[in-house]
Amino acid sequence: MAKKAKGNRVQVILECTEHKESGMPGTSRYITTKNRKNTTERLELKKYNPILKRVTVHKEIK
């Protein structure tokens, strides 16, 4: 029986970069998917941060 190949689409976690510097408690994280073949580097998207109440840059972690 053939082994199932690893999929190119993986789940990644995006975390707010500006929230750490603000010193406020809590964190803003989003879960999304990316295609491993097309996007080899880490994702960096602008998403809404409900704690800071504005759109901030979220970067892929781990």
From Swiss-Prot:
Belongs to the bacterial ribosomal protein bL33 family. One of its GO terms (molecular function) is structural constituent of ribosome. InterPro entries: Ribosomal_bL33 (IPR001705), Ribosomal_bL33_sf (IPR038584), Ribosomal_zn-bd (IPR011332). This is Large ribosomal subunit protein bL33. Gene3D superfamilies: Ribosomal protein L33. One of its GO terms (cellular component) is ribosome. It comes from the Bacteria. One of its GO terms (biological process) is translation. Keywords: Ribonucleoprotein, Ribosomal protein. It comes from Bacteroides thetaiotaomicron (strain ATCC 29148 / DSM 2079 / JCM 5827 / CCUG 10774 / NCTC 10582 / VPI-5482 / E50).
